[in-house]
Amino acid sequence: MLPALALSVRQPWAWAIIHGGKVIENRTRGAIESGGMTTGRIAIHAAGGLKEDEYRWGAWRLAKHGVFCPRPDELPRSALIGAVSVTEIVETSDSEWFGGPCGLVLAGPEPCEPIPATGALGYFRWEPGGELAPVLPWMRHWDRPGGDNATGELFPDLDRSFREPPPKPFGSRR
């Protein structure tokens, strides 16, 4: 049974919280206060939006932590994907996941089958309904020139990575 309160997080970060060992969700103090965010068990909602530059930067950032997320067309969106406990809210942390200015410290992730639902800002009471966000054209061809994945299969023993970090699609560059 999922908790009644949920937090909407954009992919691939929602996936990383549930499956990839991401132990801090970064937010501003204003977002935490206005969103009613406190400690306790919450559901994680994968937000509906995802732009190619967001995914590209997120996948690169996760790989720096040794976490390799699924392709964008394999990440559910507009759905609850699991639950996690918020154990504290911090303004500083030595965690590699902390980007500030504040962070929700997370523990005990439990995945669930995706449950379509509409998200909202801050903590929100979720209700099942709607549909998963559709796979977008750019997602179908991710890392597949010609749509056939031939390039990725040429050198299966090499890690897929970027020579240079892709540009951060939001906020200041860290």
Model feature map: region roles:
Residues 1-174:
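Structured alpha/beta reader/binder surfaces that contact nucleic acids or chromatin modification marks
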